[in-house]
Amino acid sequence: MSNLVIVESPSKAKTIGKYLGPDYTVKASMGHLRDLPKSTMGVDLEADFEPKYVAVAGKEDIISDLKKAAKNADTVYLATDPDREGEAISWHLMHLLGLDESKTRRVTFNEITQKVVQQSIASPRAIHQSLVDAQQARRVLDRIVGYQLSPLLWKKVRRGLSAGRVQSVATRLVVDRENEIRAFEPKEYWSLDVELARQGKAGGFVARYWGDTKKRELENQAQVQQVLDAIADKPFTVTSVKRADKKRSAAPPFTTSTLQQEASRKLNMTPKRTMAVAQQLYEGVDVAGEGTLGLITYMRTDSLRLSNEAMADAASFIRSRYGDSYYYGKPHVFKTKSSAQDAHEAIRPTHVELDPERIQSSLTREQYRLYKLIWSRFLASQMANAVYDTVAIDTQCAGHTFRSTHQSLKFSGFVAVYEEGRDDEAEAVGSPLPDLQEGEQALCTNTKPEQHFTQPPARYTEATLVKAMEEKGVGRPSTYASIVSTIQDREYVNKTDKRLAPTALGEVVTQLMMERFQDIIDVEFTANMESRLDDVEAGKQNWKALLGEFYGQFHQEMVDAEAALEGVRLKVPDEVTEEICEVCGKNMVVKIGRFGKFLACPGFPECTNTKPIVEKMPGSCPKCGSTILKRKSKRGYAYYACERGTECGFMSWDVPTANDCPKCGQTLFKKSGRGRMKPFCINEACEDFLPEDKRGYYKKAESKSAEEKPAKKTKKKGTSK
């Protein structure tokens, strides 16, 4: 019996093929094979929003190969990812390949392990049309908004702009935060620390002003001086000593959102890169001594659920490696929020016994670091609470209370494996305190008043923006990474020192949207639309009825906006830089030309000075050790050169990385382009040197000599073909 299994990627095909016998052929579709056309909207607005799907250009050979394989198979298993997108890919495959429903099966894998793959093949199902419809509804919604709104932005703001339904809301979040920062008015406050010495005993300690009869802030220097005058030359008395054990429980295992946040904080990985590496770990990696293994469960999920088997495996591993006292005592179950799609588990390792160090040699640096993060977080979630010994001591003088606090780790529990990162500053632990007793006297040896001002809300990082989107219901696990990436790619938002700020363009477009398309830019409206798409998936809402309701209002807003903006052209303010024009002394501004951004003098046309924008790269020049700069050729191609220019002479088309060669210590480079690029050494004196012909460049076809070229056919006058 012949069976065909179709998945999205070759790596996934390789892993699954290992678990199935010779009766199964596993092939990859390489993603979507059918989609809306790129050149037109592809949605018939007059025919109940019927999508006009076409085969994806450039995939004709794949389609032909799959059709041939499907024709010769007795059963076809569609094994694409277990979410809306995966369900839609399977549905498109069935229609595009002309598969017979009676011999077509749908299978999904929450994890790609031998047990799960074989169980899924043994218990297939039909395609869930409600999941497909939810994906179609989102796709058509986004296409309508993009294709109708983008031309308006071209005409009224700048050519080449594009608008997106959810990306517009994400940009607004960044713009709103920037406006909060601008409107923020700092308020003064003071802290007052006193250094105290015990009377007749060794050991001093520091206490901070807390209040009088109740906690209060010192708002200005005058209030501080009142306290200083009151306590001058007076003894302090210890009025309260409170000791307690404070327990801290582990964070739950990762969801998509929390994985992206933590990878951003701890690994400095963008959400987009995090998902790309997680996809590699899910689909399968060649592990020495084990073969190809899927190392983590499906990475697009908002569920905190763990299988009983996974929790039992974790319990066994914890007891074996750390001892019984480090286990939580029972399966630690975390409550999933009501809006979560609970079809999947949380993100966890598929084989907890494969600890990161054991398989490190089989993984890339990124894979290892992300796998270690996922493995540690999962294991910690099933471990005992950490216990801290805390002490709080109050001392009083002249009716004023000063407090000292300290905490120390008493039992590490889950902290032995993992501790969650933070976006804000960690709570001060305080210095160790002497063994003070109530009623004990102390003398003040020094005072330290300090002025402070309240700080504005911080700009979003990629991590905190993902967190805000999740909290507000904007987007879903499958879309967070692409949204954060898109608003930067389209230059509505810039990232500087890991913080996101709106560009002048982003603010102009957001203001236009807020004035003319209030629903599209509204956070609540967008969150409600996500909920209604969930209803489509659950079979509670007809997807075309949802589109009809949305389009009626959106179309009217489009008509009104066109009328209101007739003859209007919105100006985007130039971005002013710190770069000074050496000709006239003005601050240069950023302009956009044929080959991208460049610096120009705002004094044009009197001053025509321009400069390329220079971007510093990681690593150092392999010839002289100076900084490497990213530059652009006259044709707009990026290359990398030493900051010393012709004095040094180094340049390369390859991209410098932040990693050094383990053999010679020079900066490693990688081939430019998308996808997984393995770094290599370009130092010819190094034993790890990789010659240019092995770096994966495309070879230009050698030009044929005149003798080899076929003669051109000439057409005689007066003759016809």
Regions found by a protein language model. Give the residues of each.
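Short helix-coil junctions and helix-kink-helix linkers
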Residues: 258-271, 466-476
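Alpha-helical scaffold elements adjacent to nucleotide-binding pockets in ATP/GTP-utilizing enzyme cores
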Residues: 15-19, 65, 88-96, 116-120, ...
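Metal- or metallocofactor-binding catalytic centers and their adjacent structured scaffolds
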Residues: 214-252, 440
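Structured, non-catalytic alpha/beta "coupling" segments that mediate domain-domain communication
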Residues: 14-37, 168-217, 381-431, 593
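Basic, low-complexity terminal or inter-domain segments flanking catalytic cores
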Residues: 2-4, 15, 150, 183, ...
